Amino acid sequence: MVKLRLKRCGRKQRAVYRIVAIDVRSRREGRDLRNVGFYDPIKNQSYLNVPAILYFLEKGAQPTGTVRDLLKKAEVFK
């Protein structure tokens, strides 16, 4: 099963997250299937590759709670 979840990047005390499609059995820093966006909580910026996200959602990928909230904020879900 594939999930859309956050992968931590950046440096200490300055986290930036990549939004990735990843196998549910992989750990957080494991190998991802595809990078579909990023989220910077300090600057409150995000970039979403909407066609790639919709592709994975159509294939049955489940977003985590935080990713679901980001997608709702960006109005990917109506």
From Swiss-Prot:
Name listed for the protein in its UniProt record: Small ribosomal subunit protein bS16c
Cellular component, GO annotation: chloroplast; mitochondrion; small ribosomal subunit
Keyword set, alphabetical order: Chloroplast, Plastid, Ribonucleoprotein, Ribosomal protein
Family: Belongs to the bacterial ribosomal protein bS16 family.
Encoding gene (name): rps16
Organism: Daucus carota (Wild carrot)
Matches recorded under Pfam families: Ribosomal_S16
NCBIfam families: S16 (TIGR00002)
Keyword flag Ribosomal protein: yes
Main localisation: plastid
Highest taxon of the lineage: Eukaryota
GO biological process terms on file: mitochondrial translation
